[in-house]
Amino acid sequence: MKIVSSIFNGLKFITPALHIRDRFKITLSISLIFITAVSCNNNDKTATKQPGSVANKETKSSPAAKKTIVFFGNSITAGYGLEPEQAFPVLIQQKIDSLQLNYKVVNAGVSGETSSGGNSRIDWILKQPVDVFILELGANDGLRGIPVSETKRNLQAIIDKVKAKYPDAQLVLAGMQVPPNMGQKYATDFRSMFTELAKQNNIALIPFLLEGVGGEATFNQQDGIHPNVEGAKIVAENVWAQLQRVLRGRLKRNFEDGFSY
């Protein structure tokens, strides 16, 4: 600004002999210099006063929020008789972390839960985000001899509620089998129920959650019902065999099969 002022003062010493038109040209040129100087000065101040402007702002990319996998089940999911870190959903989380997948596992297992009890508490569970939902209920119904039609109705209600609240969520149904204590027909109908539900709802199915564990004393606790530490590892493998397909479909990438401990 001092430079511009000096230029204007210098006009006083311009000889009066200059033609009026020439003096006008000089005055116009100096005016343009003045306007440009003021504009640049204001821009400098604006950049200084606005540290959040594009010129000064550092772009920081925040990590994407993790997707949620909910395991909704009974004592097998809850890890009855095991340390918390030995339950199969925790083993699934470890597998996911080893592959650097952006998912977190929520263990919503409750010991002794029936399909009716699950249907009663599902609304509370659905208050949190759900991207993948694994339904593991029905075993306690079978042990109590609850009619298969009633169990199926409750499981269908749970599936309907999940789909209604989170239509983009992917569901996985864990199949279960029961010994023929209640009769062979009951055992057959019970086993078929899971296949029917999976087909009717177009969802993934784990044919038998306890494959390789059920009836094997080596992999069960003393009660002969709940998996021990080694049994839980096998259950995790059974679950991962289906879950990885769901995640592969969502992420369109390859996964290594199996577990390593």
What are these regions (language model features)?
Residues L28, L99, G214-E216:
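Short hydrophobic/aromatic segments of transmembrane alpha-helices and their interfaces
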Residues N119-Y261:
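Alpha-helical cap/lid subdomain in secreted, periplasmic
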Residues T36-S39:
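C-terminal motif of bacterial Sec signal peptides marking the signal peptidase cleavage site
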Residues T48-S111, G117, R121-P129:
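Serine-esterase "nucleophile elbow" of acetyl-processing enzymes
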Residues I3-L28:
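Bacterial N-terminal signal peptides that target proteins for export
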Residues N41-N43:
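Bacterial signal peptide processing site
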